[in-house]
A protein has these predicted regions:
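Conserved ABC transporter NBD signature motif
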Residues: 64-77, 339-347
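ABC ATPase NBD coupling module
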Residues: 64, 78-95, 121, 243-248, ...
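Conserved ABC ATPase signature
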Residues: 152-157, 161, 421-425, 429
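A short, proline-enriched helix->beta-strand linker immediately N-terminal to the Walker B motif
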Residues: 172-176, 440-444
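A short, surface-exposed alpha-helical micro-motif characterized by mixed small hydrophobic
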Residues: 220-222, 488-490
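Conserved ABC ATPase "signature" region
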Residues: 129-148, 398-416
Length: 530
């Protein structure tokens, strides 16, 4: 069968501080027309660098290709090709879905305009035709109220909705090759399944080829034709998906296949209540009259009750837009809400300044989008140690650095990352920095917002075991928000299921996963790619 993309002897080096780092080390692969090839491997293995090189999106001036390196799309050599050729390929014949939508979408433009623009440029549609097509695309990727959301700015959408906007934008021009770099990272399981099925349908309809970058081996098994396993810049094993899953040869491939989470958490429900929310209600204004008075609200969270116990993990699941993140922000005290929120015996809505400072140390958060939450102008050491400067100012420099290095080692980052910057790390490594920043203060409660979504499966298991170990050793409580039900099942003692701003079901992890009572919970479990 014809090959739409051929990569031969690809070597990519990065120059930094008078040193050279080899990110991709002499790899070769090919993608057949109408087929899906997945690249899997740990964070930093070279997957995303390989993907970015296809569209020549690596930073100029720091990247070097060997003279033997070749990337051919159909008959066009991409490395060092004219800008005119690249412009004709990017977003038209080749589209890419990036891992972190908040850094890819223009924050100053409405999402509908951003999709319209690519249709007008590449498909020569009128503004009216482009808008009709855009709304149709939003419907396909299951954006609620597409006619209204088309006029939203990126920050007004949930993380999952922003990812779906990126997918719609990539599919707008019906590309011949779609490069998908962790495209479902921020999505709940039902939308993940629907979007992957949508990609498969479009692939069949248009004969589109897909290069899939992922750490989720369940997705690879279900939606890929071939797979290449990468480690330290090299392809260590490749072949048909069935052959790799049924009879892996390389020890690293075997390790990956054995690292898929799924073990049930042991129950721990006898501890005292650390945080309680009673009748938590959150409304957002969505319309004003000519006098500026709010006349319509979106009731994002509706009279919710929630309890988190010391030393236990509470899971919070539901589709994008269900109210999970809004509820979590209210529990953090950064979202205005009605009702009562009691943390460690105190109402957080009535804390004075010193009590608020203590509360902020005791309640840390690991954000969903690590790149968006890490300052690009600070080193990793400065980022991880920032909380120590605020909450433990008496520490001398050597003591502070010792704690920082220990936290980095706890999340499997080498101490050499201390002086590096976020852009020098992979998505998974940046997420581990975010986790290190949270655990370094040894808080009582950590909000885990998709804590392992950017991590490959082997590192994911290490982080999950690390979190449980820290919980046992330090008596930590976790509130875990995730679309990955395998992670929720592994970590959680008690689980709440949210839909349309309300709790539709709650119970122990064992009861909820083994004997769900509500139809929506059953739908979520059925949609999980396990």
């Amino acid at each position: 069968m014809d090959k739409i993309l051929k990569i031969n002897n690809l070597v990519i080096d990065f120059e930094s501080n008078d040193s050279i780092f080899r990110a991709v080390d002499d790899i070769s692969l090919a993608i057949e027309k109408g087929k899906t090839l997945s690249l899997v491997g740990e964070s930093g293995s070279g997957k995303s660098v390989t993907a970015l090189s296809i569209l020549q999106l690596l930073p100029e001036g720091t990247v070097q290709y060997s003279s033997e390196s070749s990337i051919k799309f159909e008959n066009d050599e991409i490395i060092a090709c004219p800008k005119k050729t690249l412009s004709a390929l990017r977003g038209n014949k080749i589209s890419m879905i990036f891992q972190e939508p908040m850094t890819s979408l223009n924050p100053y433009q409405k999402v509908g305009f951003q999709i319209d623009e690519t249709l007008i440029i590449h498909k020569k549609l009128t503004s009216k035709q482009a808008r009709e097509k855009t709304i149709d695309l939003l419907k396909k990727v299951k954006i609620p109220e597409p006619e209204r959301k088309v006029d939203s700015y990126p920050h007004q959408l949930s993380g999952g909705q922003r990812q779906r906007i990126m997918i719609a934008m990539a599919l707008a021009n019906e590309p011949e090759l779609l490069i998908a770099d962790e495209p479902t990272t921020a999505l709940d399981v039902t939308v993940e399944k629907a979007l992957l099925e949508l990609l498969s349908d479009l692939q069949k309809e248009f004969g589109m080829s897909i290069l899939f970058i992922t750490h989720d081996l369940n997705i690879v098994k279900r939606f890929s034709d071939e797979v290449c396993v990468m480690k330290e810049g090299k392809i260590v094993e490749s072949g048909k998906v069935k052959d790799i899953f049924d009879d892996p040869k390389h020890p690293y491939t075997i390790k990956l296949l054995n690292s898929i989470p799924g073990k049930k958490a042991e129950l721990n429900l006898e501890n005292e209540q650390l945080l309680t929310g009673r009748k938590v209600d959150i409304k957002y204004p969505i319309a004003k009259n000519i006098f500026g008075k709010t006349v319509d609200f979106l009731n994002a969270v509706k009279k919710v009750d929630i309890t988190i116990r010391s030393g236990s993990t509470t899971g919070l699941v539901g589709e994008s837009g269900s109210g999970k993140s809004s509820l979590a922000r209210a529990l953090l005290g950064i979202e205005k809400a009605e009702g009562n929120i009691i943390f460690d015996g105190r109402n957080i809505q009535q804390l004075n300044s010193s009590e608020t400072r203590r509360f902020k140390k005791d309640f840390q958060i690991v954000f969903q989008d690590p790149f968006g939450s890490l300052s690009p102008r600070m080193t990793i050491g400065e980022i991880v140690g920032e909380g120590l400067r605020v909450h433990e100012p008496s520490l001398i420099r050597s003591e502070r650095e010792k704690k920082i290095i220990k936290a980095l080692e706890d999340v499997e980052l080498d101490k050499s990352s201390f002086s590096r910057f976020p852009h020098e790390l992979s998505g998974g490594q940046r997420q581990r920095v975010a986790i290190a920043r949270a655990i370094i203060l040894e808080p009582k409660l950590i909000l885990l917002d998709e804590p392992t979504s950017a991590l490959d499966v082997s590192i994911q298991m290490q982080i999950l075991h690390l979190l449980k170990d820290l919980q046992s050793r330090l008596g930590l409580a976790f509130l875990c928000i995730s679309h990955d039900l395998k992670v929720i099942r592994f970590l959680s003692d008690y689980v709440y299921v949210m839909k349309d701003g309300i709790i539709v079901e709650d119970g122990t992890s064992e009861d909820l996963f083994e004997s769900p009572k509500q139809a929506y919970t059953k739908e979520l479990l059925a949609a999980s790619l396990s």
